[in-house]
Amino acid sequence: GALVFPGGRADLMDDGAELAPQLVRSLASGGPATLQVTAIRETFEECAILLAREAGQTGMVSATRAQELGHYRYLLQGGDTSLAQFLARENLLLACDELIHYANWVTPDFMPRRFDTHFFLAVAPPEQQAIEDGHESISVDWIRPAKALELIDSGHFTALLPTICNLHRMSLCRNAAQVISDSLDRSVIPVTPRLHKEASGLFLRIPTNVGYTFCEQKIEKSSA
C-alpha cells in the first residue's frame, strides 16, 4: 500500500470568499488561505482529526465531540453538505492558526498531470482518534518518521519522493515541538524534482539547497 499524508485537491467550498469570516479562525501566516482550509477539511474527511474550535472557546473540540461530528465526513465527501453549512450548523471555527506551512512541491514538468502541493504541520488535538474513512484511506496510524522510512525501505509501503523527503527532514528532529521549531526557521521554497538518466537507471532528484538531506529516488532500473 501507498504511505501518504492526509490531503487532497482544493475544492470550491474551501475558498475563503465562500466561507463567512466568522467561520474561520485567524489564518496561519504561511501558505495560501484556501489551501489551509483544504488541509483541515481533507484531514477531517480522511482520518477524522478535526482542527476546529467551538465558537468562543480557545481549546480544540474534544475527542468526544469530534466523534459525534464524524458523520459529516461522508456528507462532505458526497457533496451532501458544504463546509460552510457544516461549520455554521455546529457553531465551529476552523483552527487555521494552528497550521504551519511546511513545504511546497510541484509535479515535474514531464508528467501529464501536474499539481502544486502544499504541506502543513499541526499538533493533533489531544485524545482525538484517527479513523480511516474506508474510501480515500483504508488504514491510518501514528508512525515515527524514522519508523516510516524503515517500512518504506523494506518494501512494506511505497511512497513518493515528496513523502520520503519530508519524512527524512522530520526524522532529524527529536519530537513534534522540534519539527515545528525547525520549520519556523525555514523559508518554504517550491521544489520541483527533475529526471536524471544514468547507467544505473532513472532518478528523480531535487536541488541540494532547498532544505532536504535526502534528495533522490530511483524510479527505474537500468535495462543493461
Predicted ranges, named:
Residues F5, L83, L195:
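Short clusters of hydrophobic/aromatic residues that line enzyme substrate/ligand-binding pockets
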Residues T58-Y102, T107:
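Charged mid-protein connector segments
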Residues G1-Q77, I138, K147-E150, S154-T158, ...:
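Conserved Nudix-box catalytic region and its N-terminal flanking loop in Nudix hydrolases
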